[in-house]
């Protein structure tokens, strides 16, 4: 292949930096610099301060971060439960029925998240299940949006499982429930933790559907960031964005460590 040659490796490295720096690294560095600024009228910010981070650690900002963490935790656990159950059920179906189930779970990802938010709002704004104005409608919307990723991740892991493990357990007298709990789920644990981390990260950054549903006492951090930038407080909003990124990365690092330990068992 081209990248096996010395020139190919150099070209790949140059292409990576040419694409990575302006498209990914530079915008994040700009947000980081803006979070410490009080003024930005030239190439670099001036009037450096940590006041924006001090404000982010108290009051409304801290409550919004807590709300985002709790919402993401609840949504990722629900999505992992539903997605795993559906993937296990789909594994026993025929190809045609499995394709239908795949399409149903992918549908919320195929449409704009604001459409999902509107659908959840309409569905849960009337009895018998009246959740409009509560935190639970936000959790449900996030769960609907991220369950597809849990389902796809677990489905892919199930296809890679060696059936010899299950056959060996069954030959020793283990029933279906015991095979599931003692063989399949432990083998799936690395994929389950990866799916949970992905669902958590996606939920932490969700905004479009959340804007349609959140009640005043349950404001996630992305909504607060949008509100800050909308009223012109770009530097304060940048600090909140850095806090959101840091919290998400720390959670993903924790999940990665759990996944590594599970993979080495």
Residue ranges and their predicted role:
Residues 44-57, 216-230:
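Short hydrophobic, aromatic-rich alpha-helical segments embedded in or entering the lipid bilayer
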